[in-house]
């Protein structure tokens, strides 16, 4: 689950991080009032969406009057912002954050943290190349990124934070200020189950003080059950409608841009299924894992989700019977196809527990379901059916 910039800044401020002041506005009048309240020579109006690249997409504007603040806010709110991180439809802008005047600054830095799967620990990344995409820095000048891995038994040590401060070129009081900031960020990361933390840029102001000009936070969705206050911050308008509906039925669904719908049990098998579809010249329309406890209702909902995507021209169902029996899945597929008007080719591959019985149920159903003998055969049949 992602947080908006204003939510991220509020959370980080509660842990003692110095953040750029800002006021949330839901319309032009509120933006104009926010400009007056901030009282600077200029302000920055930022569209609040769950996507990076807002500046290049026109979602971040500098304004020098209350009238301009109102004009920019009205031009953004109610529209969809398309960036390099969104699909062609973009993300809806429901509000803007009017931020205080902080520029010019001495320099812009970068500070971020993720859970490093290779070390299974929180790893901080810092760079003197703030204000630009960290992926670009990693690709072009990786030597300018400093990494610190935190031992979960002892937490982030002050000496580690000071070492990063030295590498960033900070001096005197800035070193202790940065150490406090980084320690607060680690505490926030652990206590709120962050999956991602990023401040870009972390500005060094003309007076030498540090300030988080932007804030990006991603929460581990698996931990939301123990984070009720964080869960309340979820903005469902920023999520794909089908993905949102899938989560209500405990279906793992990710929309893609192909034309072959996939229904699979198991994340690994789902990824392998998408790979072999690509290998055979097809394009998967989605990732959909119905899980080990697939039932008729879940299969029906999975079918509905897949077919709501009008670009889907065929469906490949790939089930490995382990925990779940193939005959039960076959019965659910038959019931789902009868309940829903499925007018695209459907190829079914069943393997494992009661696979033969499952295939018999499908063959005797009288429905236009194509059985496949193995994953390779299934991929070839669905690609051929879609291209026919």
Curated annotation (Swiss-Prot):
Domain ATP-grasp: 9-245
Catalysed reaction equations from the record: succinate + ATP + CoA = succinyl-CoA + ADP + phosphate; GTP + succinate + CoA = succinyl-CoA + GDP + phosphate
GO biological process: succinyl-CoA metabolic process; tricarboxylic acid cycle
EC numbers on record: 6.2.1.5
Keywords: ATP-binding, Ligase, Magnesium, Metal-binding, Nucleotide-binding, Tricarboxylic acid cycle
Gene3D superfamilies with a match to the protein in the record: ATP-grasp fold, A domain, ATP-grasp fold, B domain, Succinyl-CoA synthetase domains
GO CC entries: cytosol; succinate-CoA ligase complex
Residues engaged in binding ATP: 46, 53-55, 100, 103, 108
Nucleotide-binding in keyword set: yes
Cofactor, how bound (note): Binds 1 Mg(2+) ion per subunit.
Cited function: Succinyl-CoA synthetase functions in the citric acid cycle (TCA), coupling the hydrolysis of succinyl-CoA to the synthesis of either ATP or GTP and thus represents the only step of substrate-level phosphorylation in the TCA. The beta subunit provides nucleotide specificity of the enzyme and binds the substrate succinate, while the binding sites for coenzyme A and phosphate are found in the alpha subunit.
NCBIfam families to which the protein is assigned, alphabetical: PRK00696.1 (NF001913), sucCoAbeta (TIGR01016)
Subunit relationships: Heterotetramer of two alpha and two beta subunits.
Protein name, as recorded: Succinate--CoA ligase [ADP-forming] subunit beta
Gene: sucC
């Amino acid at each position: 689950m992602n947080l908006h910039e204003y939510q991220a800044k509020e959370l980080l401020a509660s842990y003692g991080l110095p953040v750029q002041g800002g006021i949330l506005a839901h319309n032009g009048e509120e933006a104009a009032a926010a400009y007056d309240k901030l009282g600077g020579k200029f302000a920055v109006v930022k569209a609040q969406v769950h996507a990076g690249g807002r500046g290049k997409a026109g979602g971040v504007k500098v304004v020098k009057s209350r009238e301009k603040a109102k004009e920019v806010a009205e031009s953004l709110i109610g529209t969809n912002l398309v960036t390099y991180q969104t699909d062609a439809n973009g993300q809806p802008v429901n509000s803007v954050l009017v931020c205080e005047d902080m520029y010019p600054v001495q320099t812009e830095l970068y500070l971020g943290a993720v859970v490093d799967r290779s070390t299974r620990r929180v790893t901080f990344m810092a760079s003197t190349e703030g204000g630009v995409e960290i992926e670009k820095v990693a690709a072009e000048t990786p030597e300018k990124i400093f990494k610190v891995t935190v031992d979960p038994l002892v937490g982030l040590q002050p000496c580690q934070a000071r070492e990063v401060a030295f590498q960033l070129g900070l001096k005197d009081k800035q070193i202790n200020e940065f150490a406090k900031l980084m320690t607060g960020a680690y505490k926030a990361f652990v206590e709120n189950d962050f999956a991602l933390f990023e401040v870009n840029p972390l500005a060094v102001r003309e007076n030498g003080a540090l300030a988080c000009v932007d804030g990006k936070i991603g929460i581990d969705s698996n931990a939301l059950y123990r984070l009720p206050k964080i869960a309340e911050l979820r903005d469902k308008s920023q999520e794909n409608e089908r993905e949102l509906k899938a989560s209500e039925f405990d279906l793992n669904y990710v929309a893609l841009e192909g034309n072959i719908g996939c229904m699979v049990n198991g994340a690994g098998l789902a990824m392998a299924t998408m790979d072999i579809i690509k290998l055979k010249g097809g394009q998967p329309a989605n990732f959909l894992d119905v899980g080990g406890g697939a039932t008729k209702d879940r299969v029906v909902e999975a079918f509905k989700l897949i077919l709501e995507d009008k670009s889907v021209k065929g469906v490949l169902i790939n089930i490995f019977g382990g925990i779940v029996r193939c005959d039960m899945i076959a019965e659910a597929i038959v019931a789902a196809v009868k309940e829903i008007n499925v007018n695209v080719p459907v190829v079914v591959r069943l393997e494992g527990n009661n696979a033969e019985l499952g295939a018999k149920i499908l063959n005797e159903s009288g429905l236009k379901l194509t059985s496949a003998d193995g994953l390779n055969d299934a991929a070839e049949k669905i690609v051929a059916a879609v291209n026919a």
